[in-house]
Amino acid sequence: MGSEMCIRDRWEAGPRLGDRVAVIGAGLVGGMVATLLRTFPLGRLQLVDLDPARKGLADSLGVDFAHPDDALPDCDIVFHCSASEGGLERSLKLVGDEGEIIEMSWYADRKITLPLGEDFHARRLSIRASQVGAVARARRHRRTTADRLELAVSLLKDPVFDGFLTGASKFAELPGVVQDLAGGRLEALCHVIEYPAAGSDAAGPVPENHHTT
C-alpha cells in the first residue's frame, strides 16, 4: 500500500519539469515518495526530517537531506509525511506562493492546530488531502486501482527498495513486535513478518490473539 500511496500522490501533485519539491518526514512513506521522485527532472528535491540519522537513507537514495530549520523555502510542492503538527506547520513555511501541500499523514483521532491566520490566504496556499482508496483525479478515467497496484508491484522490483527493510521477526513474535513499534523501542522503516510455510511449525505457536476467518 505504501508504494500505491506514493504513486497516487505523484499523479495527484503532477510535479513539472524543474519544480522545487520538499518531502517532510523521512519514514517509510516519505522515503518512498523521495525514491519515486529522485529520477524525475526536478529543479530541487529535499528529504526533510528532525532525525539526523535519516540522512543515511537520503544518501542511499542520492537525495539531499535537510533538518526542518535548514530546508530550502519557495517550493512548488511539499509532500507532508511526518504525521505531526510541527511538520505540517513547517510545510506552510516551505511552500511558495500559490504552492500546494499534499497531506499524506494519518492523524486518526488526534487534533492539530495550524497558523492559518497568518499569510495562508494572502499567499493562496493549498493543502490537499490524500487517500489511497481512490485513483488520483488526474488519472481516474484512464487507470483502475488494479492498474495502480500492478504498477506499484513492478516498481518495487527496483533493488533500491531493499534498503527500507530494516528487520524481520517470526509470525509468533508479532504481538511483541507491535508493542515495541508502538512504544518506540523498535526503530524500523519496514519490519518484515515472516509467515511459516504451510504445514510448518517453524515460526512457533500462533499468537493467542490471532483470529482466523
Q: What is the role of each PLM region?
A:
Residues 11, 34, 55, 88-92, ...:
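Generic hydrophobic/aromatic pocket-lining and core-packing "Φ" positions
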Residues 23-26, 38-90:
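Adenosine-nucleotide cofactor-binding segment
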Residues 29:
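Hydrophobic/small residue at the entry helix of a nucleotide-binding pocket
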Residues 14-20:
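Short helix-loop-beta connector
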Residues 89-154, 195-210:
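Glycine-rich phosphate-binding loop and adjacent beta-alpha segment
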Residues 1-6:
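Short, small-residue-biased leader/transition segments that mark boundaries at the very start
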Residues 143-213:
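C-terminal hydrophobic helical "lid"/dimerization subdomain
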Residues 20, 43-44, 100, 126:
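Residues at the starts of beta-strands that form the adenosine-phosphate
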